Curated annotation (Swiss-Prot):
Residues 1-107, 519-584 are annotated as: Disordered. Belongs to the intermediate filament family. The lineage of its organism: Eukaryota, Amoebozoa, Evosea, Eumycetozoa, Dictyostelia. Residues 132-515 form the IF rod domain. One of its GO terms (biological process) is centrosome cycle. It comes from Dictyostelium discoideum. This is Lamin-like protein.
């Protein structure tokens, strides 16, 4: 409606200009009529007519047209005068008079001399009319040019209106599309916000899970540290007890040595006194006895010096132990003070003995003849005491060697535990660093991302990486648990094993029962086969057939019967193995093979068919040519072996992870077989301290000879 109104308003100036042209033509026609033809119009009392003002972009400007009516007194003629104002030298507007009477040209208004002309038919009037025609023709030409300009402007306006309408339609369409797009974008934003909230909740859940796992790891680490600390405290207590016992024994032995020294000095005084007062023969005898006792005194002095050196050695060892444990400082200081006090007492006793010797020299010589027999008895008892002391010293040295071996084992285990702790600390530190880096990366990515699609993709990638890390952490925990389990299997039997081993034993109890039944059947068949082999070769085949027939008839139905039958046949058809090649000696353990090149020790265990033989608490000791020793003890809980079994001890390597091992043990001590190997002694010690010894040759391989039979076996 607005566009139609605009078009009507814009078309009105053209119509007014056409009406004006028609009026001007009619006016020229009326001027050629006689004078008396008059144009009459209805009178209107000063009613101004206003024209529609039109605006154009280039040439048309605002114009105001005023129409005035003037009436003459004689003929009542209404005259209209138009005045137009033009700015900037262009036609700005056109007049549209109210068509009520035929207008006349108001020339007399501008030329006052024309108003005095008498009649219209005068020649001045005709000239005036001619001028008016010229003016009208000029006005017509101007109006035509103005009309052309108006038409061109109107066409341009119509074009612009059409363009405006097209643009308006396009804008409305684009606005609708933008509104639809904005609605879609708002929906997408809502969906993405929901997805983002879900992802953030998932991320928080994952972070909580990681925190819980970290707390579990920390708890496990604290438990392991407590266990290690308890084991270390136990080892320190055992070491302190052993050292205190040794020190007490050393003090007692020193006291006995001091008593013997005092007795020797007393005897020396007797001899010297009798030598002075007696005859020459007795003097010679006493001199010989004196020299002999002097040699013994020197020996005892050497023993004292060696004991002093041992005391110094113990002091040095105590000082070294003082660096490793703070709890031993007070005890070591007390022991050092006791040793110094004893040394002072020894010196005081020596001084007092020397004084007493000077005082009692005369008295002792008088009693010499009476005590010669007693002296001989004392010498004999002294020799016996000497032998007893030597045996005690040997036992003490053996105990010290065992303690050193145990200390080496404990040090190896402590080193392994420290390595495991460092590995766990490193893994926990790396995980913490990775978590912090992932958090930083996630923050940067959340800040740098501009589109929600990219955020979702990155969050999914982060979740996948966290899942992978969780999986890797779980595998790492399983691996560390298996390593701890393998380490606990190698711990000294005096230290109690973890409860996990008992639970694992309960889990595999059913499997062990089936395995024991199968081994029992096989061992019976082997025993029967060995007995038959000693009698006759033909009897062996008959025994095999009978044993296989009995096992097939008495075995269970299904797959278990077929497998046991096959196992029995296989065991009966292998007479050349290491278990069948030697005679069966129940309740014995012997060396079968010692190979220093491939680093393993193979033992042959002969267990009773009823109760079996367990090698728990048995020990292996390797003595190098330079005197250094290393020991390995079999752990508790080893099932008894029935029949002839081969047990292998691998040295210098840890227990393999994820692979079951049967009758195999692992001694993690490294550099056990370093050159030179020749002369290395390998000892097998039973719980009752019975020892079997093997010496390695130059090639480092010892193999039990086939004819030896029982030469290296330890009979229980």
């Amino acid at each position: 409606m607005d566009m139609s109104k605009k078009k009507s308003k814009r078309a009105s100036p053209i119509e007014s200009s056409q009406e004006e042209i028609a009026i001007s033509t009619s006016k020229t026609a009326t001027t050629e009529k006689p004078k008396k033809t008059k144009t009459t119009t209805k009178k209107k009392a000063s009613q101004p007519s206003q024209e529609v003002v039109m605006e154009t972009e280039s040439e048309v400007e605002i114009t105001t047209t005023t129409t005035s009516t003037s009436t003459t007194n004689n003929n009542n003629i209404t005259t209209t005068s138009t005045s137009s104002q033009q700015s900037n030298g262009t036609l700005s507007s056109s007049s549209s008079p109210t068509i009520q009477s035929i207008p006349t040209t108001p020339i007399s208004k501008y030329i006052p001399s024309l108003s005095q002309i008498g009649t219209p038919l005068s020649p001045n009037r005709a000239a005036q009319r001619l001028r008016e025609k010229d003016e009208l023709s000029l006005i017509h030409n101007r109006l035509k040019s103005a009309l052309k300009k108006l038409e061109s402007a109107e066409t341009e306006l119509e074009k612009k209106n059409q363009e405006y309408e097209e643009l308006d339609q396009k804008h409305t369409a684009t606005i609708k599309q933008l509104k639809q797009r904005s609605d879609q974008v708002e929906k997408q934003l809502i969906e993405e916000q929901n997805q983002n909230s879900d992802l953030t909740s998932n991320r928080n859940i994952l972070e909580n899970e990681l925190k819980s796992k970290e707390s579990v790891w920390k708890k496990e680490k604290d438990e392991i540290l407590l266990k290690f600390q308890e084991s270390i405290n136990k080892l320190n207590q055992e070491n302190s007890l052993a050292q205190s016992q040794l020190k007490s024994e050393i003090v007692s032995k020193e006291y006995e040595i001091d008593g013997l020294k005092s007795e020797i000095n007393r005897l020396k005084d007797d001899l010297q006194y009798r030598i002075r007062e007696g005859e020459e023969k007795s003097r010679k005898l006493l001199e010989n006895e004196y020299n002999r006792f002097k040699g013994k005194e020197e020996e005892y002095n050497q023993l004292i010096v060696s004991k002093d050196e041992e005391i110094k050695k113990y002091k040095f060892e105590l000082k070294e132990k003082e660096k490793s444990s703070n709890a031993m400082n007070k005890k070591e200081n007390e022991l050092n003070n006791l040793i110094q006090a004893h040394e002072r007492q020894i010196e005081d006793m020596r001084d007092s003995i020397n004084r007493e010797w000077e005082l009692k020299a005369a008295q002792m010589m008088e009693e010499h003849h009476a005590r010669t027999i007693h002296l001989q008895q004392a010498v004999d008892s002294f020799n016996e005491e000497k032998e007893r002391i030597k045996s005690q010293m040997e036992t003490l040295n053996g105990q010290i060697e065992d303690i050193n071996i145990k200390n080496n084992e404990y040090e190896d285990r402590i080193k392994e535990m420290n390595v495991l702790l460092s590995q766990k600390d490193n893994s926990i530190g790396e995980l913490g660093v990775e978590i912090e880096e992932s958090k930083k990366k996630m923050r940067k990515q959340m800040a740098d991302l501009k589109s929600k699609d990219g955020q979702i993709a990155l969050l999914q990638i982060e979740i996948n990486t966290k899942d992978n890390k969780c999986n890797t952490l779980q595998t790492e925990t399983n691996r560390l648990k298996s390593e701890l389990y393998s380490i606990t299997n190698q711990i000294d039997p005096e230290i109690p094993l973890d409860p996990e081993i008992n639970s694992l034993k309960e889990l595999v109890k059913g499997f062990e029962k089936t395995v024991d039944d199968r081994k029992r059947k096989r061992s019976k068949l082997q025993h029967e086969f060995n007995a038959a082999a000693n009698q006759d070769q033909n009897g062996m085949t008959i025994e095999e057939q009978s044993s296989t027939s009995t096992t097939t008839t008495t075995s269970a139905t299904g797959s278990s019967s077929s497998t046991s039958h096959l196992d029995n046949i296989d065991s009966s058809k292998l007479p050349t193995g290491p278990e069948q090649s030697e005679l069966f000696n129940p309740d014995t353990v012997s060396f079968s093979l010692v190979d220093s090149n491939q680093e393993f020790i193979k033992l042959s265990v002969h267990g009773d068919m009823d109760n079996g033989l367990s090698i728990s608490k048995w020990r292996l000791i390797v003595v190098k040519p330079d005197g250094s020793k290393s020991g390995f003890s079999f752990p508790d809980g080893i099932q008894p072996f029935k029949g002839i079994k081969s047990v292998t001890v691998w040295t210098g390597r840890p227990r393999p992870q994820g692979t079951p091992t049967e009758n195999e043990f692992y001694w993690a001590r490294t550099e056990l077989w370093t050159s030179p190997v020749e002369g290395t002694i390998v000892k097998l010690v039973s719980p009752s301290e019975e020892t079997t010894t093997v010496t390695l040759p130059a090639d480092g391989i010892y193999q039990k000879p086939s004819s030896a039979g029982k030469s290296n076996c330890l009979i229980m």
